[in-house]
């Protein structure tokens, strides 16, 4: 609960900062940062946002601006008081806003930003996490915020960052509407009161803000007045308080006298020095997107990108274009160098593309302007055709916006293709945003082909470099009809998988897909450049064969037919069928899935979903096929034992052990890992020559049962010793 202190009639309430905010402020105050200047960028950016909000509200209700028509930002240094003041005529804050926004409710980015800072991130990232206001404490020992919202009285917020802040009704000079932030600067930060320094920082970070930023400075100038006026002013000056700085200082700096012989004898004049307030607009640059791209330097694009996004790094690529004809709009699109920390967070406020109508800012969170998978693109769209007072509901129905969106997507894909020609930069882009491209393939059927050309993967022949599907196709053998791929958790895991043995041995290249989103991507990407994509982990893998190989395969099928039937009987519903494999070389067996079922990797991903649909799990997971390698000695010996006695318990035990091991090596998980472990331990004992009966006699009280229950529930113990 806030403490209340009464000063006469004035009520001051004291609140404690929310714990994470207090921690952040402590970090800002007690750590040395070299680029403290970013505080000014953050405060100007906040002022600009407040102005955007009131202007947007005024589009539907012009009376909102009755409390002040002019939308502007003023910067007022006061060296005598050691204060730097920023005033905006934005929407202002109510008392509740003031308490919530400046201290008692932590933004989602507070903790994330502190973690980033402690991991070595730059302080200038603060704006991206939504806590830019607190950067004021980089230079200020005390901050006072005076604010007036149309729906509330004028209030003052004050804090010296000691873990608490105060809020009171403010009866000082009325500000009409908006917010005034007064920074009481630290003794060593007075450089931010100098004209040169303020101009430098505003030019560097905020020259493209869409509202006039005016610097108010007290300056001196010489003024020429007649001798009589000078005497009068001098007399007045002496009568008044010497410290009054509003009146001009009078200095005799020379006089002009005319010759007495002149016809019109002029009065004597004197020059005096007077103090005045100079107003200078610091951001007269017109919106960069309205200019000709040929006249804009890369540095200007970089500065605009930083002021637009609060990023501390330059952009990776830029696309500046205009569309004319039936529809007219201009756009400026940027690709950042890195993905933001909350790129795929559902609840995050989207502010990637700012929508303007005829240079008037409308909104910065327009979902209809760009598809979800391009949510990392930053920039500006300025339409000539949309109405100024357009609402969100109207935007959803707007045909104009649909055409703009289509053009933006087209230009983004052009930009990606241009970037792909620069291998180094494309590698950075792909590391940051490959998931977005794959999400696009899943969601955007219209542009699926163009997006697929941008994909890059490691393959069995690409070494450390990634390769495109186009390059893969160019290397395909004459007899090869399909693009072979495998999905899994890591490059090492899939490269050593049993599934790729035969394919690689035959000299065919295999694409390694190791991100969870690849599973969704290939479900939609059925083919590329006329070549179908075939998973080497699914049934029906057809490799080009000559007549001799076909004949050998038919012989193997006939030879192992009885073993396949027996294994199917033993495993029953665990597998759909047991067949001879054409994909194995050194492994005895593997588990493949049906053509339309999930792969082992997809099953793992789906099991990890907290909100999964169990009804889907049932029919998508069920179809497993066991493939055995007819050339492997284990399988051949098992065939001989089965033919000698198909009721041999050891055969049953071995079949299940082979199946469970194949499940693991194929990427699946076991339903009952304990029973499998016990079987393995028993084999280890046999291998070491340990007699189970002796062990059981020595440990009569052991909690573990003396014998592992046989596989089929038979009461007789399994005779695995015979196999050993």
Swiss-Prot record:
The modification N6-methylated lysine is found at residues 531, 574. The gene is HSP90AB1. Molecular chaperone that promotes the maturation, structural maintenance and proper regulation of specific target proteins involved for instance in cell cycle control and signal transduction. Undergoes a functional cycle linked to its ATPase activity. This cycle probably induces conformational changes in the client proteins, thereby causing their activation. Interacts dynamically with various co-chaperones that modulate its substrate recognition, ATPase cycle and chaperone function. The modification N6-malonyllysine is found at residue 399. This is Heat shock protein HSP 90-beta. GO terms for cellular component: aryl hydrocarbon receptor complex; cytoplasm; dynein axonemal particle; extracellular region; melanosome; nucleus; plasma membrane. It comes from the Eukaryota. The TPR repeat-binding motif mediates interaction with TPR repeat-containing proteins. Keywords: Acetylation, ATP-binding, Cell membrane, Chaperone, Cytoplasm, Glycoprotein, Membrane, Methylation, Nucleotide-binding, Nucleus, Phosphoprotein, S-nitrosylation, Secreted, Stress response, Ubl conjugation. Its main location: cytoplasm. ATP binds at residues 46, 88, 107, 133, 392. The modification N6-acetyllysine is found at residues 435, 481, 624. GO terms for molecular function: ATP binding; ATP hydrolysis activity; ATP-dependent protein folding chaperone; protein dimerization activity; receptor ligand inhibitor activity; unfolded protein binding. It is found in: Cytoplasm; Melanosome; Nucleus; Secreted. A motif (TPR repeat-binding) lies at residues 720-724. The modification N6-succinyllysine is found at residues 219, 531. The record marks 126-127 as: Cleaved under oxidative stress. Residues 1-214 are annotated as: Interaction with BIRC2. The modification Phosphoserine is found at residues 226, 255, 261, 307, 445, 669, 718. Residues 215-552 are annotated as: Interaction with AHSA1. NCBIfam families: PRK05218.1.
